[in-house]
Amino acid sequence: MSDDFVVPTYEVGGSDSGSDQDISDIEEGSFNGISATPLPTADVEYVSEASPMDATASLGYLSGAEGANLYVAREGANYFNDAANKAVVLCLHSYEQLAISGVFKLQVMKGGITYNSIHYNCGLHTYDFWHPLSESIPPIAASFAADWEEHSYGLSPWLPADIKEEYECILRISEGSNIGDVGRLMAELGQLWTRHTGCTFSILRPEDYARPLILNKDWDNLQAELMIHHMNSEHDMRVMCIGGKNSGKSTLLRLLLQKFLHGNKSTTKATGVSHEADVVNYLDMDPGQPEYSAPDSISWSKLTSETLSLGQHLAQGHREMIQTTYIGSSTPQTWPEMYLTAMEHIIHKWEMEGQMNTALLNLPGWIKGFGITIINKAMELFKPTHIIFLTHGGKLISKELVVPNMFETMQKGKYKPMIYNLQAFTQHNIPGLPAQDPRYHAANIRSFRLLAHLHRLSEQSYYPGPLLSSPPLQVSFGSQGIMAFRFLQDPSSGYHQDDISAALQGCVVCLYHSKMPPDIDMCGVFPMLKHSADYTSMDFVTLALIHSIDVERKFMNIYIPGHVSGRVHSLKNNFVLVRGATDLPLCELYPQKLLSSSYRNREIPYVSFSKRKKYEYVWKIRKNVRRRGHYNK
């Protein structure tokens, strides 16, 4: 980290876009209250496009009086370099708020902080924060320690004594992972985390127009009420959130997860470490915008209070993955039957293990057509104790959506679900305020998640260059190594043997492991998984990228993420390779660096620098075919 403190000037930009992006702000006073009554029969069909709301409702921009409280770094006064720990020390008064973009680790050495309405005391624990510029960034508010006595942990001896006395809150900020290097492979996402290179985080100034995540009282009240149920529940608690696109569904679940795991942490005075870790089960059924799943996949994972990653980590946060199923597409509509089967398999496995902890269910923001089928099926399987509807203007979601009056489980017996109607977020274009940044739409964010998955070397390290610049792994197929292939486009193995190699090279595939040799039918030299075989019951390993295939010698060159390479080597055989519809980002095949003039004379896979002549291979054949209108004359 450089000794010279530089805070870059940021371009004006928005947040949240795409098929189900999170909220950036919640309008104050836009909801009249929380109701806990059974859902009545719907009278109107819910429209995903939000109805107009009060245009004078203030969005959460940090300006005016709020901007005056934003922390501004002054080196030598409230900002110090901690070279020994490769970090910086920030000193804040109790009324100041800190806005940071990027990936970083935070330790509260003195006082406390408030983040998303949750208070954190000083201690030895370090928290991981992920704040991409595509999302609204929650402010970190300085506060006092919630204790009768003042404590401090790890304060550097070189820090002036008057500084320690003057400031109520002192933080140590250190660098996080180098995931920003992955984003720079795409021209659109080069500044997804910070606006400059050289550091994984950046302190935002008031003039940078930082968009804080501001919640109204109704959202806070809902979190507080559900927190009481979480603490007092004698059995398991099951929370299900239903909402359309851009309704704030994913953000609400993320806030509830933080509330459940960090909202009631007691710490010891000696170390500042919590007494015990709480656990929450997260059933992630949204393949298009997953919170913890691999790209184009659904999963069940466990989150603990000790390792929870804060902010929007874009599926890179800490978790214990229990079950993952590759769907092969970012939308369940591509293979609907397979999606419903996979969802049922995951929820059934979670149910059979008798989990007594709180569980959160994340569904796609699809509330029309087949989306209602997904919601009804998920409700039947999950049997929620608490259901949250994010609606616009109090409109009910659908006539076809009917919530049962009673559910029954082995742990709780029969029970009536509690239903909450909450005002969803609606985006407004207000004159004079920055518009949505088009670079951060849903397709680009999905591409980033895939790049991050393929380039991940370890928990905190990512391969910064294109995969083509590194050697692939050679894996045999047939009698060892990869022992079966499956194409989701044609499960009956109707591909010709000469086309299989071409259909796999340069494509993203999923690698599964079977405990027993799979049932196959040979198609030339390729063993094809039988149509009756169910690969979703096998163990998910990783997504991978096939570089090339040597049919004669029966091996393929394949790129496997570094963080799972050890597991792949230990398993060795009985792998099943599944080809879906996952698209590889163009920057992986055609990196801008390899297209520069210095690489023009090199042989690069998939890239040709030869330029054809004008009109070469251009055929304009006139077809004397009568159009439909000709028959009417």
UniProtKB/Swiss-Prot annotation:
The keyword rRNA processing applies. One of its GO terms (molecular function) is polynucleotide 5'-hydroxyl-kinase activity. GO terms for biological process: cleavage in ITS2 between 5.8S rRNA and LSU-rRNA of tricistronic rRNA transcript (SSU-rRNA, 5.8S rRNA, LSU-rRNA); rRNA processing; termination of RNA polymerase I transcription. It is found in: Nucleus, Nucleolus. ATP binds at G243, G244, K245, N246, S247, G248, K249, S250. One of its GO terms (cellular component) is Las1 complex. Pfam families: CLP1_P. Keywords: ATP-binding, Kinase, Nucleotide-binding, Nucleus, rRNA processing, Transferase. InterPro entries: Clp1/Grc3, CLP1_P, P-loop_NTPase. It comes from the Eukaryota. Its EC number is 2.7.1.-. Its main location: nucleus. Belongs to the Clp1 family. NOL9/GRC3 subfamily. Polynucleotide 5'-kinase involved in rRNA processing. This is Polynucleotide 5'-hydroxyl-kinase GRC3. It comes from Eremothecium gossypii (strain ATCC 10895 / CBS 109.51 / FGSC 9923 / NRRL Y-1056). The gene is GRC3.
